[in-house]
Structure formats: C-alpha cells, structure tokens
C-alpha cells in the first residue's frame, strides 16, 4: 500500500504540483487550509507525512504547524514546510515547531521529490 501524504496549501497550483510530482509514488491528499487539514487529521487515518505552508488563509502564520507540534502529532508524523516567508524566520520556526525539512517558495520540484523519498524511506511501517 502506498504511503499517504497530506499536503496543505492555499495555492491550487501548488496543490496540483504536489499531486502531480508525488502522486505516482504516494497517495496524496490535498486540502486548501488549516481547518480542513485539522478536520482531516481528526476524522481520517493519519498520513505518513505532512507537507504544509505556514501561511494559511484561515489561520495566523505558523498556527497549523504549531498545532501539530502541540497536539502530540509532532512526534508521530514528520512535517515538511513549504514557505514563502523569510529564510531566517522559516528556519527558526521550523526548529521551534519540529519540522523535519523546509523549502522556500519557489522550490525545485525534483529536490522536493528526492527529499520526500528520503524521508518516507526512513519511516517504519
């Protein structure tokens, strides 16, 4: 069975790109905002990996990422951040909230795919 990735980004283009690039190897579920992601996480099986933008239209910056780190999901589900914010802020917040990797937008899809493959290969079934 394919590993599942939850992708959270308000950009339809980014969600489409993630689905296209990662969908061949993974089951990719995309949602446009933080509340949809939280609903999904509370009502569905947990994904193996979460890719999320820290700037979501329905939440303050970093609120969803912070929620993951304080909800107990942080240790169970690796989080990769796709950020359009300043590199220094992104680095410090990723460390603070336990994200395993980050990419600044615009990002290289091949580098992202390689990084995701590396991360998923280390996950225990």
Write out the residue ranges for each language-model feature.
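C-terminal output helix
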Residues: 107-116
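Acidic, metal-coordinating helix/loop segments flanking the phosphotransfer/catalytic sites
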Residues: 32-49
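Alpha4 helix (beta4-alpha4-beta5 surface) of REC/receiver domains from two-component response regulators
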Residues: 63, 86-101, 114
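Two-component/phosphorelay signaling modules centered on CheY-like receiver
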Residues: 12-30, 97
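Active-site residues of response regulator receiver
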Residues: 53-54, 83
